[in-house]
């Protein structure tokens, strides 16, 4: 792989890492929100939806980690 393509791939890795950090921040905020839902609402629809959102964000973070690793392997 030539230097130009490696440089382009590294730029993509940098962008993915930035997106991952942003997602992790949102995930943390959503988890804090979920953890502070009053006990009498914890069995409700809102709490269930919040749990689904947290799981989806976690999956998205993992996917970005996988993508970043794959691209970094290609660069080597």
Residue ranges and their predicted role:
Residues 1-76:
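Long, low-complexity or tandemly repetitive, helically biased scaffold regions used
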